Amino acid sequence: MDTLILNGYDLTLQDVYDVAYDGRKVEIAADAYARLAKGREIMQELSKGGKAIYGFNRGVGQNKDVTIDEDFMETQNRMMLRSHSLGLPPFNTDEEVRAMMVIRLNNMLIGASCASDDLANSYRDFLNHGITPRIPRRGAVGEADITTITHIGLAFIGEEDVNYKGEVVSAKEAMEKEGLKPLHLQLKDTHTIMLSNSQGEGTAAILVHEVENLVKMSDRIFCLDYEGLNGNIEPMREDVNELRGLPGQIRCAARCREDLEGSYLYSDNRPEHALQDPLTFRGGFIITGAVEDALDYVKKFLSIQINSPSDNPCIMLDKKDVFVNSNFETTSLVIGVEMLAIALAHLSRAVNYRLIRMCMPEFTHLPRFLAPRNGSAHGYDEVQNVLSCLDAENRYLTTPSSVDFYPMQGSIEDHASNLPLAVTKCRQMVDNLRYLVGMEALFASQAVDLRKSDDNGDYVHLGKGTQKAYDVLRAVVPEMKSNRSVYDDINKAYQLVLEEKFLADGE
């Protein structure tokens, strides 16, 4: 994989994933170093001219009225870094932290932050040498993640532990092994480290990636469920969905048609089917389409934020001046994340309803609870309790957190977004949905097997994509022909979803 050249302006979400998951190397564009130097020059000239500059020659928060002498700046940097590193466990994953770091490195290169070259190089070197700071997940309110991402700075100066080659070691030890030196903090470096929403943005980027793949797998398993039901395929027609015009719906319907290519559902000699199926079947792909529409909203604002500065004050290179601002606000993005959570709750409820219905013989014309025909097993009867539990938790997790905040710092900081918390809740929903989608794969495959076992079951042949999903599951979970631990089946199916085994080749 080629080296990613960062310049502050054109980082993509795919670039973030490449760095976070695959360890893609990064380098800093030459013109970015020039912008960093110009920003420092402007800041120092204005300060020498007597201009009060927040976070540079003045304190931060309620201490904005405290003057900081130039001789005290290095000490102030260390004091502020230590005093603000207050995050609480559990810790973010390595992938999340790497996403945070590449995002913060990128948007500081615009030149609005007064970052030193050494600070930018520290981000680059930690990424390229596989040294990952341990960032606590809790403690930030999303109005710049000042109490959590400051732990990155402590790692840079060698004062905290890091994840390195599968072990937790001191940052100093990891740097020594990689031939790196601790960062010497200069000018406004600590303020640059802390005045960023990179925890919320980095975790949101990972969330987007996970949801994109979950939706694809959910659509494929939904189609397999549709085959288990012997459902009416008409709602998936291209012309019908184009008539409505919703982008997510159109994409998901097209994906379902592709997965069902060659399916018996398109055959003229299949058994009689219902004229109209329940909405969670008839419009299942429309519900995942709504998830994709919410994703589009999140990606729009996230892509803007990872390529723009959140620094306060910000240096305007063309104006040769510094301006206070509130560009670290993440309200638009957090509203998108909470909208995504609501969309995922709709998906959760739809899966739940589908699986409860699949246990009803009057609906499926298959044995009750999809039990083997010999009547010797309970099938999936008690799984409904697990489904309902997970769905109830998902409903609870949709409760907005972005409007829960308190005035702080003498009421100067009287607004917040709780973006990191909103993302954390949404990612828990994703993990719950992995179980739900895995259980839908179990139900769907069992329904297909039961339909094949009918006296006239030769008509059952699966689609191009659904056959792959069926084969992936049956490679680890055999057909239920008698009582066995469904607990094991559920966890095996979950693992397949977690490892994204149900995705098509190349996705």
Question: Where would I find each of the regions flagged by the language model?
Answer:
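Glycine-rich, flexible loop motifs
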Residues: 1-14, 19-50, 75, 80-136, ...
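FAD-binding core of FAD-dependent oxidoreductases
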Residues: 54-76, 83-108, 134-157, 167, ...
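Acidic, glycine-rich active-site loops and adjacent beta-strand->loop/helix elements
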Residues: 60, 87, 106-107, 127, ...
